[in-house]
Amino acid sequence: MAIAERRSRSHLALRVRDRVSAEVFFEERFEDGWESKWVKSDWKRDENMAGEWNFTSGKWNGDANDKGIQTSEDYRFYAISAAFPEFSNKGKTLVFQFSVKHEQKLDCGGGYMKLLSGDVDQKKFGGDTPYSIMFGPDICGYSTKKVHAILTKGETNHLIKKDVPCETDQLTHVYTFILRPDASYSILIDNVEKQSGSVYTDWDILPPKQIKDPEAKKPEDWEDKEYIPDPEDKKPEGYDDIPKEITDPEAKKPEDWDDEEDGEWTAPTIPNPDYKGEWKPKKIKNPNFKGKWKAPMIDNPDFKDDPDIYVFPKLKYVGIELWQVKSGTMFDNVLICDDPDYAKKLAEETWGKNKDAEKAAFDEAEKKKEEEEAKDDPTESDDEKPDEEGESDGEGDDESKDIDNEEDDEDVHDEL
């Protein structure tokens, strides 16, 4: 108890000291009493498909007192949210950060969070609830292993056009999304920038400033063929008289061939090595080649600049809404603020402080798992070993078993 109190006091000291320069809109470290701030949705509960959350530090960790919330049931939907005083990020930097750990070695499922605006019935929060920002890792099979960064404008969800690979191991990782007043952004994983750019270019929120002139047409005399037939090249005399096949000069009439019984003998034909097919003049560089024609660009009459493209004026909720085939994903240390430095310090104080101990705990858990699996493996005793005389037959049996096992594996793969 004394250790937990000292830990809370040290956290409080850091919060007070660093919050002087940062405006923190929401911060959740999932300590005792966290449930008073979070609302578990009834979404999918009537269908018995709503998953339950565990409050835990996980199977392996760097600090048993540092807990988060973890999905606990396979093949379930999860939805939970928390409210905070409504604010707009206009004229200020928006920082959205949280940590995720996929203890279950995730095959298919999300690890992302959402920011919502306006008034939301939190008990009905689910997959159809509109959101402003969706951010975080998503894994499914071999094809999807990326960080989502989706910005909603109007009723359209705009996906980031750049690839941002996510972490896929079973350890804790911190994901940070920074959106600035100049519409620039950064995506960090474990306090390391993985992607950056501009909202103007990396999301298709606005129509393009310029478009191809729809009225433009390629001039009739435009030469877009790089090579043309050589007008000086002439077909050789007698070219068309060259036969496709000729009589095989090596063929000889069989000695036992009887013209009366077998008919008149005819030598077989073979492809003519001198036959070159249909004659075509050789190609030369087109002296009038102008390149591939492109329609000229013109200003897009539908383009309208939006200096507030980065703005979300009524942010009010943070939520987790996802589907998981295999449960075990843990969320912790959720932060919404205006100061990237504060977010970085929070990440270092939590994830950074515990990552080495967590890795050691994970390695130890894996070692114990391997030892247990080794104990469970059947070993062949001496009295079960085949004698020398029957050794050949035994090898044949093993080979037959191997073939059967391979066929079983193929059947399982086909079923999947």
From Swiss-Prot:
UniProt motif (Prevents secretion from ER) ranges: 413-416
Mapped Sequence repeat ranges: 194-205, 213-224, 230-241, 248-259, 263-273, 277-287, 291-301
Family the entry assigns: Belongs to the calreticulin family.
3 X approximate repeats: annotated segments: 263-301
UniProt KW Disulfide bond keyword: yes
Lineage top rank: taxon: Eukaryota
Subcellular location: Endoplasmic reticulum lumen
Job description of the protein: Molecular calcium-binding chaperone promoting folding, oligomeric assembly and quality control in the ER via the calreticulin/calnexin cycle. This lectin may interact transiently with almost all of the monoglucosylated glycoproteins that are synthesized in the ER.
SUPFAM superfamilies, per the entry: Concanavalin A-like lectins/glucanases, P-domain of calnexin/calreticulin
Biased composition (Basic and acidic residues): 210-255, 349-378
Pfam families: Calreticulin
GO cellular component: endoplasmic reticulum lumen; endoplasmic reticulum membrane
Glycan attachment points: 54
Entry binding sites for an alpha-D-glucoside: 112, 114, 131, 138, 321
Keyword entries, A-Z: Calcium, Chaperone, Disulfide bond, Endoplasmic reticulum, Glycoprotein, Lectin, Metal-binding, Repeat, Signal, Zinc
Alphabetical list of PROSITE patterns matching this protein: CALRETICULIN_1, CALRETICULIN_2, CALRETICULIN_REPEAT, ER_TARGET
Biological process terms in GO annotation: ERAD pathway; protein folding
Chain intervals for the UniProt region annotation (4 X approximate repeats): 194-259
A GO term, aspect molecular function: calcium ion binding
InterPro entries with a match to the protein in the record: Calret/calnex (IPR001580), Calret/calnex_CS (IPR018124), Calreticulin (IPR009169), Calreticulin/calnexin_P_dom_sf (IPR009033), ConA-like_dom_sf (IPR013320)
Protein name: Calreticulin
Acidic residues compositional bias, start-end: 379-416
Domain notes: Can be divided into a N-terminal globular domain, a proline-rich P-domain forming an elongated arm-like structure and a C-terminal acidic domain. The P-domain binds one molecule of calcium with high affinity, whereas the acidic C-domain binds multiple calcium ions with low affinity.
